[in-house]
Amino acid sequence: MSNNTTAVTGTASADPFDDPVTSNKMAIRALIPLLITFVLGTLCLQGFNLVFQQVGAAVGAPHQASLITAFPSIVLGIVCFIYGSLGDFVSLRKLVTVGLVTLFVGSIFGFVANYFFAANLWTVIIARVLQTAGEQVAGSAFLVVATKYLRNDLKVIFFGLFTAAYQLSASIGVFAAGMLSSIAWQFLFLIPSVTILFLPILLKTLPSKSGNGQKVDAFGFVIFGFATAFLTLFFSYMAWWMLVVSLLLFVAFAFYINKASNPFITPAFFKNTRWLRAICLILVFYFVNYALSPIFNAIGTNIYGMTTTQVSLHIVWAFVVAAVVGTCSGMIIRKIGIKAGIVTAGTLMFLGWTGAAFCVNSGFVVLTLCACVFYAGCGLMYSPVVSTVLGTIEKDESGRGVGMNDLAMNVSPSIGIAIIGSLLGSNALAGGSITGVTGTAANYANLLLVAAGTALLGLIVFFVFKKKIYEGNHALETEESAK
């Protein structure tokens, strides 16, 4: 009797995430609601990015309207790393619970405070900060769960769905913001509020164990968080003292992790040369990812006499292409392999930029087709490059790996857009171009060629580092298991 009771108790208390078969099923059940939450949160983010000037005017602060997007961007820059890293130490169940509740509170507070009471700039900002901090939990948890608990051959599929979801929500956000702003912009706050209904499902399907059992290194997270915050602020305001403060904090962080007994990330993590080479792929390939929209907007406005709305209605099709390719990227990578996937994606990005550079005066429809080629490359790139980078580290470090990936994907294009943006406004490259155009068109063509050169550099980096990156890389297990 006693033995039977013990057996029953042992079975009942067994963690399904300890068994590869059951963990895979549980992970899939958790990933779907996490993905929907991420989509709705990103949709809200993109919507406010489109109408923030209208919101600023509505709350009586048109000259401070940029703060509506600036503060959430700063928060996003901090939490994208911290949430992923916390996945190695804190129960994902607890982390997601806090995130969904924060997202819900921000949504309801933002709507009630600005719809039923006098709209105020700071209630909008506070609500958007809460929403951003909450929704990013879903994105980070999705990547951690997919990395730690999914079968290798399914990882590329769900990574592809993740990037597809982001691109799709970005395109839908444009239309949602336009539609809701004509009714009342306050309703944008309510879009992600329904995700609180997923909490009961996620409480049953997410792992409850607390990572590796170590205490959370709060001091280390604070130093790194402030360093990241000042770095993000620098790219928002281009104030050099912010960059100096950020660098000093990163130096202090490096000193701290070398001296602390249990830092959340050790110096050994950064001494992993395979990871360092792999993360270079993200830093280079994603460097100009934010540049296409402003360059195309400038071309449409100054060369074709289009409005920003007309330009966005063209570019949105490129986002749709990225979403479709991203959805299919898992199947594509399973067919052609991770290495060929990165080469194909990088080539599409290069061809998209180069084609646009040579077609500046060929009509905006032609430019839109070039944008579709570029974004097809973006949609295909995410799955194999993330699999490659995370394949260079151990699974018990995957949360920190996800955090570093997110940080690289946010910081690298922020640097890129700061450089491209300054050149875009100064017409510094308007002297002439190998594409044959002159004047303002030459400036745009040369900027597009610079972006094409970045994609080409990414391919060169890949071929130079390929052998070292894939020595013992876990990502290659995907190809081997699929054969």
Question: What is each stretch, according to the model?
Answer:
Residues 49, 140-143, 161, 166-179, ...:
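Glycine/proline-centered helix-kink
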Residues 65-69, 73, 80-213:
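Helix-loop-helix hairpins in multi-pass membrane proteins, especially solute transporters
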